[in-house]
A protein has these predicted regions:
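Charge-rich, low-complexity N-terminal segments
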Residues: 1-117
Length: 117
């Protein structure tokens, strides 16, 4: 029998942004901020040590990326000039080759997923 394992860890950061590609009367056209939450998922076979990846090792990969965005204007970050939740999830996925999926929450009710195919 073959079993696939996934682990997910949640991270948080606060940042401001505006969406330059929306209509002028759209509320997100103006600068505003979010308390973002991201979930990083890793899918892989179980290793001999009982882990897919140790959460501590995952933190060493993700924390520096979160630090690049925390308390920043996301529009100023290369690759996030149009910082939709979709683009933010893609930004993380492109920088975390080990991740199988990234989920970015702008609010508790609104999120976007980027999934490696």
């Amino acid at each position: 029998m073959s079993i696939k394992f996934s682990v997910t860890r949640r991270y948080t950061f606060e940042a401001g942004h505006f969406l330059p590609m929306v209509a002028d009367d759209h509320k997100c056209k103006r600068q505003h901020g979010h308390n973002y939450e991201i979930e990083v998922t890793v899918t892989a076979p179980l290793r001999d040590n009982g882990f897919i990846i140790d959460f501590w090792d995952l933190d060493k990969l993700v924390d520096p990326l979160v630090a690049q965005l925390d308390h920043r204007n996301l529009n100023d970050i290369k690759g996030l000039e149009n910082p939709t939740a979709e683009h933010i999830s893609m930004w993380f996925l492109l920088r975390l080759p080990i991740a199988s999926a990234i989920r970015v929450f702008e609010t508790k009710d609104c999120w976007a997923d980027a999934v490696r195919t």
